[in-house]
């Protein structure tokens, strides 16, 4: 056995009511915090700022999707004016992305309080958008110093959004099982993530106020984000990035529809990873079980219904083959055409 494990340096506080610990945990980060949120969560941000007392020097509630450079400019100006020495971000991917951008630009450390299942708070991946062009990169300095997970803050997350985000997280974990730069710790986190999410998402669909299921789902998404931050992705993510960029398809829903087919494609080359996935999903063929899980949760499995033109299959396959991510099974145009043809129609995956 040979591997490299380079753990990411962040502190995690997890549990119902943990948001009450933010003021104490801020001592690990700084003493003059600029609190960040989207306009929609400004009220929650104000409440959080109030609990911080004089440790909160101001509020910036203009975070938006895709982290526009203009928004970062505005937030950086406020941070400088208030002499902030850190940020506290409450919300989902948009707010976390802004906190990361400020860490990158101003070296401001952050504390993050996630209220969605995005998982980006535990990855060193950052992104910025300017003039319609998105630039991404990896840098450990954008990682929050502290992440406070309070499942109670996710109780109001709509079930449909929870399911889409949760299935998206399963995709991160599944590919972590066979990442070329994976290791035993990543595999353990990935398997546990899949198990927690497969168990909790049906319960959330049945009762979105189920506090235990919400805790399980948030736990699973933390693990999935940790996997994404520690290991590379493969065919599944390449296909989803290609479809999203080429046909402007919805991110999480595209992941859900493609995943069973990508797993079926790679399964013959990664038997040990499939054993782990099967165990996490309660037995059986992982690709089939993932398809059945998604259908049972009411997810749309047809790429055509999500916006992909049927005449776009050949183009997508050519793009995927032209610049592939490292993958355990060789990627062929013929194989991808077959895979996408079934995903476009929403059919079950072809398994061995």
UniProtKB/Swiss-Prot annotation:
Superkingdom assignment: Bacteria
EC numbers: 1.3.1.-
GO molecular function, one term: maleylacetate reductase activity
InterPro entries, A to Z: ADH_Fe/GldA, ADH_Fe_C, Alcohol_dehydrogenase_Fe, MAR
Gene3D superfamilies per record: 3.40.50.1970, Dehydroquinate synthase-like - alpha domain
Residues spanning the signal sequence: none
Ligand binding (NAD(+)): 93-94, 115-119
Disruption phenotype: Cells lacking this gene lose the ability to grow on gamma-HCH; growth is restored when a plasmid containing the linF gene is introduced.
Keywords linked to the UniProt accession: NAD, Oxidoreductase
SUPFAM superfamilies (alphabetical): Dehydroquinate synthase-like
Catalysis performed (reactions): 3-oxoadipate + NAD(+) = maleylacetate + NADH + H(+)
Record note on cofactor: The maleylacetate reductase family of enzymes does not require any metal ion for activity, despite being related to the family III metal-dependent polyol dehydrogenases.
GO biological process: hexachlorocyclohexane metabolic process
Annotated pathway: Xenobiotic degradation; gamma-hexachlorocyclohexane degradation
Family: Belongs to the iron-containing alcohol dehydrogenase family.
Summary of the function given for this chain in its UniProt record: Catalyzes the NADH-dependent reduction of maleylacetate to beta-ketoadipate, a step in the degradation of gamma-hexachlorocyclohexane (gamma-HCH or lindane). Has an essential role in this assimilation pathway that allows S.japonicum UT26 to grow on gamma-HCH as the sole source of carbon and energy.
Protein name per the record: Maleylacetate reductase
Gene: linF
């Amino acid at each position: 056995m040979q591997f490299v494990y380079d753990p990411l340096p962040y502190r995690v506080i997890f549990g119902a009511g943990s948001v009450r610990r933010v003021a104490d945990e801020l001592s690990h980060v700084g003493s003059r915090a600029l609190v960040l949120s989207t306009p929609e969560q400004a009220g929650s941000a104000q409440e959080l700022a109030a609990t911080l007392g004089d440790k909160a020097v101001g509020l910036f509630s203009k975070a938006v999707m895709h982290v526009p450079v203009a928004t970062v400019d505005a937030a950086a100006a406020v941070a400088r004016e208030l002499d902030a020495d850190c940020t506290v971000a409450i919300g989902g991917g948009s707010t976390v992305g802004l906190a990361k951008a400020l860490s990158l630009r101003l070296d401001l450390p952050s504390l993050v309080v996630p209220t969605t299942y995005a998982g980006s708070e535990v990855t060193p991946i950052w992104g910025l958008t300017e003039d319609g062009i998105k630039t991404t990169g990896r840098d450990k300095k954008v990682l929050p110093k502290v992440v406070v997970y309070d499942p109670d803050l996710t109780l109001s997350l709509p079930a449909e959004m929870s399911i889409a985000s949760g299935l998206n997280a399963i995709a991160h974990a599944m590919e972590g099982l066979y990442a070329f730069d994976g290791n035993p710790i990543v595999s353990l986190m990935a398997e546990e993530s899949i198990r927690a999410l497969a168990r909790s998402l049906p319960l959330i669909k049945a009762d979105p106020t189920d506090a235990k299921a919400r805790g399980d789902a948030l736990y699973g998404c933390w693990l999935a984000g940790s996997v994404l931050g520690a290991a590379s992705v493969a065919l599944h993510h390449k296909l989803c990035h290609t479809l999203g960029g080429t046909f402007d398809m919805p991110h999480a829903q595209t992941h859900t529809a493609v995943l069973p087919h990508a797993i079926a494609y790679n399964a013959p080359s990664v038997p040990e990873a499939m054993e782990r996935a099967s165990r996490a999903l309660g037995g059986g063929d992982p690709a089939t079980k993932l398809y059945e899980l998604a259908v049972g949760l009411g997810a749309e499995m047809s790429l055509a219904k999500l916006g992909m033109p049927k005449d776009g299959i050949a183009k997508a396959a050519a793009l995927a083959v032209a610049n592939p991510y490292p993958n355990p099974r060789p990627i062929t145009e013929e194989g991808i055409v077959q895979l996408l043809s079934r995903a476009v129609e929403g059919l079950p995956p072809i398994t061995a």
